[in-house]
Structure formats: C-alpha cells, structure tokens
Amino acid sequence: MSSDRFGLKRFVFSRFAGSLCDQFLLFAVPLAILKATGSLTFSSLAFVIEWLPRILFFPLSGFLADRIKPRFIFFNVEAGRCVLMLVAFLTLTFHPAATFPVLAVMMALLSVAYVLNFVATEALLPRHISAEALPKAHSMLQGVDQTTQVLGPALAVAISVYGGVGAILACAAVLFAVSAINYLFLETHDLEVAEKMSLRSIVQSNITAIQVLKQNKILLHLCALTWVVNLVYGAALVVSAAVILKEFHLPESYFGVLQTSAALITLITFFFVPRIAKRFGLSTLGTLSFCGMILSGALMSLSLDYAMYLAGYALLMAFDGAFSVYLRTLRSQIIPQKHLGKTMGLIGLMNMCSVPVSGLAVTALAGRFMPLQIIAIILVFALILGLMLVIIGRRTFGYNSWLPPVIAQPQA
C-alpha cells in the first residue's frame, strides 16, 4: 500500500495532536500534584503509579498490535483518552481536593494507551508503507515528537495561566477527539491471523521472545545498560519540578522553559548523531552518550542556580536521545525480524522497569535529602553500576570498545 493511499500525512497529523497532549500532561500533572500536596513524595509516587501499568502492558500490546486492525486500535485509544480527560476535568471541577488520586489514576490509564499507541505504530508502518518510504515516515514521526516537546510545555504554560490544570485537560480532550475522528479516515487492511486470540497464544508469544533473548544474551546486556541510563533519566523527570519550585524558589513557568530548552537541544543534537555514528562508529556514539549523561547529571546535582541546572538537564535529555539511537540501531541488527514485535514488547517491559524504580528511590530519599542531593545519590549509584556492566560486557562478549559495537547483520 502506498503512503498516499494509506494516508501518511493524516496519520502524522493525529500523531502530532496526540503527542502534543502528552506533552501538555507531562508538564502540567507533576506541577499540579506538587502544588496541591506540597510534597515531593506524592509527586514521585504519582510518577511510579503512572509508569507501572505502562511497563506491564508492553508484552500484551505487541500481541494485540499483531492481531487487531490498526485503525480500530488508534481510534479507540484516542477516543478513550478524550473521555478520560473529560472525566478528570469534571471530577476536579466538583472535587478539587481530589487532585492527587484523580491525576494519578488518569496518568496510569493514559500510560496504557500510550504503550498500545506506540507499539501499534511500530507495527503499522512496515505493513502499509514501502521499504523505500519508511525512512521518510520515521523521520516525520521523529520530527513530530521533537516539535511537540518544544511546543507542548510552552503552550501548556500559556493555557494554565488562564485556567490551571483544568484548562489543560479540556484542551487535551478536544485535541484527542480531533485525532480520533481523523484516524477514522485511514485506509488500513485487516491482519491475517491464523491462531485465535487466547491466553495460551499470549503466553506462547512471550515464550518465543524469551527464547530469542536466551539465544542473544547481548540483548540482556543492552537491557542492563538501559536500566542504568533510565535510572538517571527517571530521577531527573521526577525531581526537576521540586528543584525549580523548592530549591530555586522560582515560578512554575521556569519549569516550562526547562522542558522546552531540553527539547530544543535534543532536536539540534539529532542533526549530529548520524554524522558521529558514521564517522566514528556506533559504539563511539553510545560511549559518548553514556558519558555525557553522567557528566550532565553531575552538573545538575552541583547546580548553584537555575542556569546551571537548565544546562545540565538539557544536555542530559539530549544525550539520552542519542543513546536511544545507539540502542535501537544495535537491537535491530540482532533481533530476528519475524520476532521483532514480541521481543521488543518484552524488552520494553524490562527497560521501563527502571523508570518507576527511580521514582521509588526518590520517594524513599525525599524525606531525608534535598532534591539536588537525591540526583547526586542516584547518579553515583548509576555510575558504579554502569562501570561494572562495561567491564562485565567486555569480558563476556569479547569486544574491545567500551560498549557493544555492530556485531551482526539484520536477521531474517
């Protein structure tokens, strides 16, 4: 099916609307909970509540994406998110004291929708677009994600000035509704599935994914490295709102500037990532990104003012994006293509576990340490664990570089 017949531009538009809403909420919810409760503990606990359903749903989402018509998935996900926004908006309008439970439950349900949308997108494009058009399609989606990371916080600040988190929820409901209606006009074909959907088929799909991991143990090594990176990344996401409001005593608009600046730096970084990988090799890209994240985290933890923290946070997010490119490229050369979906579902589950773990760590430390001290503690732990993994990986798999290089051609 050609991209014109499928409606790639229509799909990208809906992706833009949905991603913009995601960025609205990622900006507004932590601030709303922190302002309502005055506690970093509740803010980090909400982060954990959001991420747990996300990681648990990864294996099932890959299974569903291989069996259900894509248009049906996308429409129902967006329609469900629209209804959820309206319910949250009405509940907070009549019961403003219930901010924490309402927003925590809302984000948990949204995280499930996000995972299904993400995995369904990964399965959709190769089935509806030619191999020659895939790079362009992925570039368009990457551009959408980076653009909304810039626009989202800035627009959320402007909207919240007039109506707080309620106005953001109402705007998100409208955008999700527009996105859902737009998805109805996509031309997607039904999937040919010989095996009926059952608990047994779900279990068998994940058993196959486990076998792939056993046969390619370096994938487990990459998962462990991802854990280390996500510990630092997750801690930065959880703590940043408290750093801005409590340590630097700045208004919440500065949090929007922080997010927008990070997205801009990340967008600029992606122009250099392919050149670095081509000239110096994929392993060098991974090593530079990993070291850059550690140094950026150190800059954050030692920040004396907002400008230092902004620089460290923006660089951390940029290097995290570059490290993700390294991981995705290497995984695609190791995992057999026929098992890519189910294996990525299982890998996604393992990788994402580290993000709520960082939230739990912040929750445990919040009562005894200041936000910047929490970042420093988690950073030191991640550095020690990362160095141990580098040594173990070099000895186990026999490569000479700091991180695993390209070791195989894509498998069929």
Positions of PLM-derived features:
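Hydrophobic alpha-helical transmembrane segments
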Residues: F100-M107, S111, K136-E192, G256, ...
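Membrane-helix boundary and inter-helical linker elements of multi-pass secondary transporters
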Residues: K35-A36, D66-R67, P96, R127, ...
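Helix-loop boundary and gating motifs at the non-cytosolic
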Residues: M1-P53, N216-A262
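Short loop-to-helix capping motifs
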Residues: R5, G38-S39, G164-V165, Q215-K217, ...
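Substrate-agnostic recognition of the 12-TM MFS/MFS-like secondary transporter fold
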Residues: R10-L26, E50-F63, K69-C82, V102-V161, ...
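Helix-breaking motifs and short loop linkers at transmembrane-helix boundaries and internal kinks
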Residues: T37, K69, T91-L92, H249, ...
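Juxtamembrane intracellular "pre-TM" segments in multi-pass secondary transporters
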Residues: M1-L8, T188-A224
